[in-house]
Amino acid sequence: MVCEGKRLASCPCFFLLTAKFYWILTMMQRTHSQEYAHSIRVDGDIILGGLFPVHAKGERGVPCGELKKEKGIHRLEAMLYAIDQINKDPDLLSNITLGVRILDTCSRDTYALEQSLTFVQALIEKDASDVKCANGDPPIFTKPDKISGVIGAAASSVSIMVANILRLFKIPQISYASTAPELSDNTRYDFFSRVVPPDSYQAQAMVDIVTALGWNYVSTLASEGNYGESGVEAFTQISREIGGVCIAQSQKIPREPRPGEFEKIIKRLLETPNARAVIMFANEDDIRRILEAAKKLNQSGHFLWIGSDSWGSKIAPVYQQEEIAEGAVTILPKRASIDGFDRYFRSRTLANNRRNVWFAEFWEENFGCKLGSHGKRNSHIKKCTGLERIARDSSYEQEGKVQFVIDAVYSMAYALHNMHKERCPGYIGLCPRMVTIDGKELLGYIRAVNFNGSAGTPVTFNENGDAPGRYDIFQYQINNKSTEYKIIGHWTNQLHLKVEDMQWANREHTHPASVCSLPCKPGERKKTVKGVPCCWHCERCEGYNYQVDELSCELCPLDQRPNINRTGCQRIPIIKLEWHSPWAVVPVFIAILGIIATTFVIVTFVRYNDTPIVRASGRELSYVLLTGIFLCYSITFLMIAAPDTIICSFRRIFLGLGMCFSYAALLTKTNRIHRIFEQGKKSVTAPKFISPASQLVITFSLISVQLLGVFVWFVVDPPHTIIDYGEQRTLDPENARGVLKCDISDLSLICSLGYSILLMVTCTVYAIKTRGVPETFNEAKPIGFTMYTTCIIWLAFIPIFFGTAQSAEKMYIQTTTLTVSMSLSASVSLGMLYMPKVYIIIFHPEQNVQKRKRSFKAVVTAATMQSKLIQKGNDRPNGEVKSELCESLETNTSSTKTTYISYSNHSI
């Protein structure tokens, strides 16, 4: 009958439903058979909707095309199977029967939108007061099924279209195959959930694979459309966020490619030859044609394909392209074959499966026969007997999404079960509170479900309604002319990849590279190319720098140097002057000889202490001088010994003390001679402080100044050891060494020796002043020669010591120079002042006798005559004065102090 509608009551999407108003009314006026001609209806207490691509897209003007046996029939039968299992389960929705209303989307989003309006009919309030039929009777409306939730759809484009309608009526939707990332937008698709992971997870898995294989320079290839472009976009975004992967170029395959288009794409990919890895989000046909083009251009083994789930483990894309596809890594959502469904589906016949309105069509397609009035009218097709059996008389393999269809139905069932437990506690069947199910409330229960699915894996949803990502990773391998997709790993929020099981072209197990630049060697940093972070030049970390990370070098701490590969720092070896070193052997040898000689002289002097020569040399000051000489030799051992606090303390004390002893004694001697002869020129009165006791007091007073300075040094800067890393910090870190030494700077050393050098210089001045003393009284001349030689030694010491401050051998040179200089100074004093005396004492004892006893008056007379004859002496060689000067002196027997004079070795 014909009816004219004037008004439709208000609803949440009035502006949208107005356009469909007449279509809905037409649908509602159909007879029962007409209404369900393209749907499956199973009655129940709670009705679930289902959307499946039973047919493919039709040609222009025709909404539906050929039957899709696997993606259509297998999947909708999986929903019916799940409904049967739930209704038989006494522990799940007990005494509540689930019914279904399954529609065909015909793989077209617009057609699916029209079909899905059936699900919202019961939620649209109708005002029929102004609606009249042609005969004036009120219209009769068929009561539509009230849909509580929808299972589907398959294609993302269909799910997007349907989700926009269902959300307006608050009908929860669970998809079993839609993977578009945009469906994760909970603000736009808040009532949409899915038991399959979104392509963003797949993209994440592919990024992880690329990273695990060390590929940082890749190209992307997408089929034009939502699936390909969204997948590549997700891959690009994730790779940009985590860093480390650069996109060399992104190519798109047009929906309607021109001839030669695929060859052009391959040539463009070859423009960046280092980007061998190609990320593919493309449909099956595009994958096949890309492989054909690569084969045509003879690029076997060059490209490293990373395929999405549209490639998966399919044979069709690689058929007759095996060599070009070898090594391809593909990804596929983890799934399992459900044995219970296999038994169920194989048992389906025309007799026991009348609820499936498309099963007769499937039967004809599957067995290649015709069914009477429903059969195909082609005469050459055999007639169906009805005795055919699935898997026996036809090939059968469970479709890959069957598991997810079952899990989607069970997710809805568990949500309803939990809702019933809370809203109808203890109530058998539906309670009044669940007669009308609040879709928003049901959505909350759906998002909260957590159960083991049909394959034994957990089924859960996140806050966006997405299922966790679980993927199997395959590699296409060729072994002994046989091919296979071998599982090489899996991905469940993180990658587990068996790299050792991977095989590449030419049966190699070492995975090839897809990088813009080769990795830098250890100890080299990356200097990235501007704008291309995956391309770089390698620069070596020089000097004492080590590689901190890929991009930077840093200076090692002062006490460390780079290790052999410059990836870290290691302690610099600590060295000290060893006893066996040539730098130590020479000064030690000299010191030992000097100590032996000094000891021999001391023993000789002690043994012959009362002989004229020993007495005439000034015994008291001689022993002080010999002590200083002994200390000068001994300091060598302290300077070479391993430094510690005690050794450093002794070094400070004895470093200048030996020289101070020596030169204080010599200075006192030369000063005494000078004062005596100067006084003798003026008067016959003896100068003050020329007695032995006075001489000792003067000497030790001079020495005490040195000791006082050392004491102040101890207080201001207590002795301790240091490790000097700057002394031997060579240009080559391998030769760098830390020097263990006492904390005595060059300045401190000069200050310590400075006082002794001052005494030495003063003594030299007095030696020069007394150089003209008559030979009878002249011990001043040997002292003078001693001081001249000593000055030369120390003048040579200064440039050698300070000129090696920047040398890597500084410690050795300075220590050896200092110890040898002190030993040579001591040797000069010992050799010139005491060896002649010892020689006479040992080998010429007849000369070690008292010749004359002279008074100070004799000295005065000698001094006076010496001053008178000095000018005459200037006319003689070397200013010598005749020895008869001494013979004219008369003996004075007064009580004044006398001096013993040896004509061979005079001393005062």
Curated annotation (Swiss-Prot):
User: Where do we see the Glycyl lysine isopeptide (Lys-Gly) (interchain with G-Cter in SUMO1) cross-link in this protein?
Assistant: 882
- Membrane topology, record value: Multi-pass membrane protein
Please provide the record's keywords in A-Z order: Cell membrane, Disulfide bond, G-protein coupled receptor, Glycoprotein, Isopeptide bond, Membrane, Receptor, Sensory transduction, Signal, Transducer, Transmembrane, Transmembrane helix, Ubl conjugation
A Pfam family that this protein carries is NCD3G
Annotated tissue distribution: Prominent expression in olfactory bulb, pontine gray, lateral reticular nucleus of the thalamus, and piriform cortex. Less abundant expression incerebral cortex, hippocampus, cerebellum, and mammillary body.
- Membrane-crossing residue ranges in chain numbering: 584-608, 621-641, 648-668, 696-716, 747-768, 782-803, 819-843
Keyword Nucleotide-binding included in the entry's annotation: no
List locations, semicolon-separated.
Cell membrane
Signal sequence: where? 1-33
Give the Extracellular compartment stretches of this protein.
Answer: 34-583, 642-647, 717-746, 804-818
Molecular function as annotated in GO: G protein-coupled receptor activity; glutamate receptor activity; group III metabotropic glutamate receptor activity
Q: List the disulfide bonds.
A: 64-106, 246-534, 369-384, 424-431, 516-535, 520-538, 541-553, 556-569
Q: Which GO terms describe its cellular component?
A: GABA-ergic synapse; glutamatergic synapse; neuronal cell body; plasma membrane; postsynaptic membrane; presynaptic active zone membrane; presynaptic membrane
Q: Provide the glycosylation site positions.
A: 95, 298, 452, 480, 565
Binding of L-glutamate occurs at 156, 177-179, 227, 309, 401
Q: Which residues lie on this side of the membrane: Cytoplasmic?
A: 609-620, 669-695, 769-781, 844-908
Question: One biological process GO term for this chain?
Answer: adenylate cyclase-inhibiting G protein-coupled receptor signaling pathway
Family listed: Belongs to the G-protein coupled receptor 3 family.
Q: How does it assemble?
A: Interacts with PICK1.
**Biological function:** G-protein coupled receptor for glutamate. Ligand binding causes a conformation change that triggers signaling via guanine nucleotide-binding proteins (G proteins) and modulates the activity of down-stream effectors. Signaling inhibits adenylate cyclase activity.
Indicate what this protein is called per its UniProt record.
Metabotropic glutamate receptor 8
Organism expressing this protein natively: Rattus norvegicus (Rat)
Taxonomic classification, please?
A: Eukaryota, Metazoa, Chordata, Craniata, Vertebrata
